[in-house]
Amino acid sequence: MGQPGRPEFPDRAARRPGGPADVGSLVVDDSPALCAALDAGLGASLCLVADNAGAELLADLALVDHLLATGRSERVALHVKPYPYFVSDALASDVAECLAVLGEGPRGRLLRAAAEGRWTLRTHDYYRAPGWYRDAPGDLVAEWAAASLTVFKGDLNYRRLVGDAHWPALTPFADVVGYFPGPVAALRTLKCEVVVGLAPGTLAALDASGEDWRVSGVHGLLQVAGL
């Protein structure tokens, strides 16, 4: 049984079709550390950097509602793009559309949280600019630094976070994002060659599988640093 108020998840070792037999859907799974940090209050002031609109953004809003309703977060800032990199990128207008189709309960709670200043919607021109987050302007860095935890979602945000370089896959995630001004988490589906923080056994199994695992969209990861 899980803790009260915490949603139950399927077996984290569940396999995905097309993946190597001894590697699960997540090639890195730091969710136990992330959940423990949230339970310990690290998400009190959380910055969530969104990725896609549509169903994914609805899930993001459900997460924000859950974090606020359970007290795992006192304040959540949802960061979206001012203009899309890709047609699917979440914008402020998408948040409004998602709120309109949410059930009365979560919609009402989120609107009250917004009125009380516990949930804010933020954007910044740098989210649509070419460049790495290491080189982000000072006012955006200050927003990340003010958060007790920043969560980046999506493949593009991951590439910008780690610098989109040809890192050896065994390079520790914490080393690559050591510049970041506070605790950070990254969630993404692998759709490009860039990946860090793999365990040696995981990398060996993936490379031996013959699968084009870095870009196939079959695998994902959840990584944390600075918790």
Task: Enumerate the predicted regions with their spans.
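Electropositive, gly/pro-rich neighborhoods at or near active sites that engage anionic ligands
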Residues: M1-C47, A53-A59
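Conserved structured core elements
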Residues: V28, L57-L61, R134, G138-V141
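N-terminal beta1-alpha1-beta2 submodule of the flavodoxin-like/Rossmannoid cofactor-binding fold
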Residues: L68, K81-P84
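Short amphipathic alpha-helices and their capping/turn segments at secondary-structure boundaries
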Residues: L34, H66-A69, G138-A145
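C-terminal functional extensions of proteins
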Residues: V80-P82, D89-L227
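Histidine-anchored nucleotide/phosphate-binding helix
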Residues: A55-A77
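Residues at the starts of beta-strands that form the adenosine-phosphate
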Residues: S45, S73-A77, P183
